[in-house]
Swiss-Prot record:
Region of interest called G1, as start-end residue ranges on this chain: 19-26
Family: Belongs to the TRAFAC class translation factor GTPase superfamily. Classic translation factor GTPase family. EF-Tu/EF-1A subfamily.
Name of the gene encoding the protein in the UniProt record: tuf
Annotated segments matching region G3: 83-86
NCBIfam families: EF-Tu (TIGR00485), PRK00049.1 (NF000766), PRK12735.1 (NF009372), PRK12736.1 (NF009373), small_GTP (TIGR00231)
UniProt organism field: Mycobacterium marinum (strain ATCC BAA-535 / M)
Name of the molecule in the record: Elongation factor Tu
Binding site residues for GTP: 19-26, 83-87, 138-141
Keyword DNA damage: no
Amino acid sequence: MAKAKFQRTKPHVNIGTIGHVDHGKTTLTAAITKVLHDKYPELNESRAFDQIDNAPEERQRGITINISHVEYQTEKRHYAHVDAPGHADYIKNMITGAAQMDGAILVVAATDGPMPQTREHVLLARQVGVPYILVALNKSDAVDDEELLELVEMEVRELLAAQEFDEDAPVVRVSALKALEGDPKWVESVEQLMDAVDESIPDPVRETDRPFLMPVEDVFTITGRGTVVTGRVERGIINVNEEVEIVGIRPTSTKTTVTGVEMFRKLLDQGQAGDNVGLLLRGIKREDVERGQVVVKPGTTTPHTEFEGQVYILSKDEGGRHTPFFNNYRPQFYFRTTDVTGVVTLPEGTEMVMPGDNTNISVKLIQPVAMDDGLRFAIREGGRTVGAGRVVKIIK
């Protein structure tokens, strides 16, 4: 059998802080780790503000993003929390999916109310499919006027409702700074916020519960046994003797049966999301399958050539293009394991797209790719990444 699995006793949830610059996202992240450390010292280590603020650089689909990860636990759950300090970092994270969120804490300063970036972050959260948002009304210690607090709360609820988020979501009045300083009233406010996070953010759908999908990375023949495809299982579970479909790149898809699952040269009964496996396929020749295709539960994923995407185009400083692009731009779109050339149509009224922009585009690929809404891709020119995006709507 394969190695012992990492045992998690609690549900694992990915969350993040979003909101306007200087409204206190990073301070709140530090306050949460401190308050939970003090409340459950055996479960949590404390993290200083500057450890979180000096966010390390990460590369995701060829794009550099500054992003901080902290972990903490409540009695109920284990959380991984991401904080992207800069506005551009947040946008890049959301579009490239460097850190996906099961829910978000929208930080709004009670002293300012919602600001332009607050709206933009909520809109992006909607577009990239963040399932739930609740609100931390930060700097509430600095506002004495109850009516003003209620007004800001109402504005925030209207903003959530406008993007079809739950307008009855918890809005918790906090002071991250005072909580960090240990003021008991405001420490309690952060505890209340985390209770609200525990209660209101739904348990995520586990990847293993979704229909099976594995992108093909490599194909080879084992003499006397047949053709093996290797890759990392993206979602779901595959059992020996189950039927699968090979989809994408070719004009038609092929059905076959998995006669063996291998991991670390050991035979398994099943492979599941996250495993790097080899699948032995019945009656399939080496030339019947290629990198860039996906192996899926039959009928669950279809190949498409036309879609609308939401994209971020790298600036020159990030190693992107030095010049804008126009209608009929023809880069490669890198989906999962392979590049496919596509022709870009810009939205009505957009003449060109500048390096550093984020925009929506329509794309027509020269080969079909197995895709669902939300699938991420990189935009490349001769192997160099010039942008990243996600499928927002499948056209054909």
